[in-house]
Amino acid sequence: MLNFLPFFKNASEESTLALAGVMQAADLVRQLARNGKMDTPVFQTSIGSLLKLEADSTADVYGGLAGVETGLNTLLLYLNNTQQRDMEVMRYTLGVIILEKRLSRREDLLDAIGIGVEQAIYQTEVFGSPTHANVLAKLAEIYSQTLGTFNYRIHVHGNPNYLQSTDNANKIRALLLAGVRSAMLWRQKGGGRLQFLFHRRTIVSQAEAYLHQLK
């Protein structure tokens, strides 16, 4: 089986970053579906994380802590503020985690994703950007042919005019695939439902500490 995700030491210390990566992708899906646009640099980082097969740390997957700052803030908003948090983002986050769990049992699909991601990396080198339309179309195809075959589907809600756009649909599928990549990394780091139940304060503390480093 081709494992397209690196495994790092000190798993428990880095799971918060990986979870932030999941929520960052989910928040970008929300932005695009509702507004037809999103934070471009953050989008580039999330897609880039999917294409980075070798990294020295979880932070390095996102190009450093700054690359997942939006995700860390989104994570804190969900855990700390029940009034302002956007449940649509949480729904996408949970959906991605469910898909990743089902994917983990399918070595054939993991192999297919790994091969497809390597092809997307080659396309990135050819076209010069991880967010080139052809690269995004390839990533969307990977999602549809693998994760899209499960009975469980993530239903994205938003403005129909934006959702009907082929380019936007490709971006959304690519982001969901990036979210699944982060969810797999999160699980490798010991992430799971019990974390939310018994270690929320620890997650908040870690996220705040990471954000403090960025000041």
Regions found by a protein language model. Name each.
Residues F7-G21, S57-D60, N81-Q84, E88-R91, ...:
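Non-transmembrane, amphipathic alpha-helical segments
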